[in-house]
Amino acid sequence: ADGSKFRPFERDSETLARKWAPAGTPGLEHRVGGLEKTHIGVLSTDAANHEMMVKERAEKVARVAADIPDLVVDGPESGDVLLVGWGGTYGHILTATEELRAAGKTVSRVHFDFIDPLPKNTEKVFSGFRKIIVCELNLGQFAGYLKTIFPQFNYLSCNKVHGQTF
């Protein structure tokens, strides 16, 4: 690689990711620092550049959604109740779903493996249900996050914060 042409702060036009320069590669030497820079690597405190970079970083994260698998609904794709979980609630919600179905209830569930960005089909999945019950082992931060992105849905929270599983 010709180091005079290598621009480590330029971004790929499709993914907005910066170019990869494995450490020690001849011709790709450069400095990395925590201060914001322009696309050519010059330190910048310019307000317009800062705004552009903030928007560019947000867009980079949003574009990751194209590579995130769609949510898979366990159960009917529409109905009264959708149980929602993420992280360590997977097994507990699966068991609750099975027990509710054994009791004759119709219930569906989804488990989020990706939360920022959310899977592309999240809004479509949610639109099929009257109530969305978000089960969390915290104070309901994920439910709050979902409400900010999709405020049109009816969310209920099932939270447990005693340091124990459901």
Where are these regions (language model features)?
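Flexible, low-complexity linker and terminal segments
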Residues: A1-F166
